[in-house]
Amino acid sequence: MGLRIALFGQAPFGRDVALRLAEAGHEMVAVHVPPDGGGRADPLAEASEERGWPLFRHKAYRKAGVAMPQRIEEHASHEADLNVLAFTTVILPPEIIDGPRLGSLCFHPSLLPAFRGGNALAWQIIMGAEEAGVTVFRPDEGVDTGPIVVQKGGVPIGAHETSASLYFDHLYPLGVEAMADAVAAVAEGRAEFLPQDEDGASFQGLVDDEVARLDWSLGGTELDRRIRGCDPQPGAWAEYEGEPVRFYGGSLEAGVSHGETPGRVLDPDEEGRMRIAAAGETALRITRVRRAEGKKVSAAESGIPVGGLFV
């Protein structure tokens, strides 16, 4: 049985979820994307326009913490059976979340209840999780706390994984499958809504520049995870001669008897990557850097010499 779906999302993930659901016989009665920022067109918006799906670009659905009446009325007019939240960044009021007769389904890129919050991808790497996965749940009044409908795991987090590779290579395709499975289960009346186990719950805040700042008193393993977890955004960083420098394409080198202060630039490796001394006989290998507000360049082109010190 095809459902009338109101989809809230963005980017290629939102597009692919919408296309997958449409192929399964569901009708997109409303597609909500972020307002047009004047840059590259949103892939979900483009797909909606090509297929004639009703498209909305609202900046907000609440004002001063209260649901905007015009948004509630508009949403009700679509007579959606189900809301599908495909990586949306907007905060929807309960009147919209609970409006459709079948409620809402929301995607999250972790194995809930672990790693709740808006930067789950980064924190899984930063905190050394060994396995990743995705969850589709029914949202409630909490942050990523609602009952689970579909969960898919078994994704190992490799030693060279970044937030970007974890998402695009693994959790993105797995997430599209999970969303399709969850909608099918709801449509067919066989969905189970399993409460989350609070004993295994964790919540992490946003990964901002304070989190991304490298602390050279930490061991190389912790610094390597932070660099990879913050790649590509916001980019782990340290100061060189009073200037912020962000690191990308990082990896850990163990068993290095460098005898140097952590943060000191060592001789580059055979591939030209920057090597930086870290605590515990380790070094960080860096492929690309971005100085201040400049562009990313190869570490060899950074102009930061051997013997330079990051603080």
Question: Where are the regions that the model predicts?
Answer:
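One-carbon transfer enzymes
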Residues: M1-P234, T282, R291-K295, A300, ...
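C-terminal active-site/capping subdomain that shapes the small-molecule cofactor and substrate pocket
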Residues: D224-V311
